[in-house]
Amino acid sequence: EIRRAAAQGTISLPPPANSEGLEDLAVLKSCLKVIRELSGFRYAFAKDAMAETFAPLMASVEAKNELERQGLKVSLKSYFLSLILKDLENPDILLIDNYINALFNSANEAANGPITVQTVVNVVNSFPQDGINWRENPQTDEEQILLQPDTFPDSKAVQVELARWEKYSKELRDLDPLVHALLTNLYFMAISPLNRHNGRVTQILLQLSLMGQNINSPAPCLMLGRALITNAHFGIEERLYGLRTRQWSPYLQYMLKTLSKAILLSGELLASLQRLYAQTEAYLKMIGLASHAAFLPVIFKHPACRTGEFS
């Protein structure tokens, strides 16, 4: 009944109690944009050709690790390029090469700690031709390194937003690493601290988070939790242009809490799948079929085990 009401736009939530500090209309609208994408994650980045590189990226990381275990040396960047660039005369190669540089130039840093403001600076500097700067900073000329290591936004508001985001990124929480990576990523997209291309930088930051923690894909958690955020999403959307910012910000908080809970539950389900894998492997060994355990990785990588079909 709730889903039907939400689909018809007739669902009604209780009136907001307070604003709890979320007063920035631009931030809230950015959150809503991300929420709409998350509610159908398979198509969230469908308009961005770079999304096609995500799966090959993770595959190349795994392939490189396997080759190194065999004592062979391989350049991860060249391996990745060979996977996604079949035609080296492609006019988009400059953008793709910058995108890959942004990933691999920051990969070592990401592996050694959380994503920080310095990581953002490193990623932005991989696209000097795009004129990316901090939001509300004076516009600078293109074709130059825009953000030096000690650069910080001129705007005090943007400084505060970034400082809070970095603190959240560094906090050790009782969350699955994937959950924390996703929420940190959502937080960055919400504040959108750059004057342009926040979406592209956000995608790269997410990939760095996943690479640093050896996480393969964000899809399972969000697919499993998709239905649980629909109610809150419609509640906010219905009131977006009808209420003052301070009135509907509690709905955003409600949605974010619901999303966090949904992802946490999905993380628990993924953990149970890992336990099932270990139990299955132990059982096969116990009954004398240890050789069959070699097939388990293939079985457990089936989409039914990784997306939303268990929900």
Per-region residue spans from a language model:
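FIC/Doc superfamily catalytic core
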Residues: 1-311
